[in-house]
Amino acid sequence: MKVDRRNFLSGALAAVAALGARGSNCSPASGGGRRTWGERLAEKGMLFIAHRGCQSLAPENTIPSFVCAARLGLQAIETDVRFSKDGKLICSHDESLKRMFGLKKKVSDLDYSELRTLVPTKGNGLTSWPKELLRIPTFGEYLDVCEKYDAVPFIETKGDKAVVKPVLDEVRRRGLSRVAVLSSVSFDHVLEARRCDKEIFIHHIFSKPEQLDELAAQGNAGLSYNYKDLSTVPEGLVASVHAKGVKMCLRAGDTPETVAKMIEMGLDYIPTNVTVPCV
C-alpha cells in the first residue's frame, strides 16, 4: 500500500502531541483483554517487529519513531531499556551518547532531567518533528504508545542485570506480562526475566547452539542466531529449534527479498529497520 508521506506525518505528529499532552499513564492498564504474544503468532503465522521504532521516518528510540511504527501497523515495537544515573528507566540503544547526540558522555553519567534536554543529531526525519518531541523517552512513555495502539512491547534490556526486575515490574503493573516480550543479548538477563516472571515471552539475541536446551527448559521462549547472510544458515536449523519448542528469528528483514526468504525458512517473527520502504 502506498502511503502519502505528508498526510501520514501530519497524523502521526498530532498523535505524538496528544500523547505528550496526556502525560505518562499513571494507573495500571487492563491487559487482560489483549491478545498474548503467542496468540498473535498463531493468528498471523509471522509477526514484524519495528526495530527501535520506525527508523525510516524518525530517529531511533523516540516517541515519533514508536508512533509511526504503530500507525503503520507493525505488530511489535522494539526498544532498548537502561538506567539513567538517577535510576530512571529510559530508552536508548547505546550507553554512549556520542553516536546519536554528539555528546562524549554515557547515559549513566546523567540524570534523566539532563538526558531529556538532549536532541538527536543523527537519524531520519530530524526536521519533520519539533525538537521537544525527539527527547529521550522514558520506558513508561514507550509503553503508553504500545498500549494505545495495541502493539507488542518488544523490550531489550541493556546494561546491568538489575534493570530486568523494574522493567518487568512495570510491565506487570500494566497487565502486559502475557503480551510483552523481554529480550537481551545477555543470557543472564533472559534467565533473570524468567525468574521474575513466569508468563512473559523471553527472547535471547544472538544465542549459541549450546544454550538451546537451557532456553527451551525456561518455556515460552525464542532466540536469534547471528547469521548476517541467510545463505549460510545450516539446513535444518530452524526445524531443530522448533523441535525444542522454541521460536526463532534472524536479523534483519530490510528488503523484500530477505523477508521472502525468511518466510520461506519458516521463521516466526522478523525484526526490520526499514519498516516503510514505500514511503
Task: Please provide the spans of the model-predicted regions.
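N-terminal secretory signal peptides and thylakoid transit peptides that target proteins
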Residues: 1-16
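C-terminal active-site rim and adjoining tail of enzyme catalytic domains
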Residues: 11, 126-136, 203-279
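C-terminal segment of N-terminal export signals and the immediately downstream linker at the start
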Residues: 22-49, 57, 70-72
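Metal-dependent phosphodiesterase/phospholipase catalytic core, i.e.
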Residues: 36-39, 93-199, 225-228, 242-244
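Structural preference for beta-strand elements that scaffold enzyme active sites
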Residues: 47-49, 76, 152-154, 179-181, ...
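A cross-domain feature marking catalytic cores of carbohydrate-active enzymes
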Residues: 52, 79-81, 155-159, 184, ...
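Catalytic domains of carbohydrate-active enzymes, especially glycoside hydrolases
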Residues: 68-81, 221-223
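Glycine-rich, proline-tolerant flexible connector loops at the mouths of alpha/beta enzymes
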Residues: 83-94
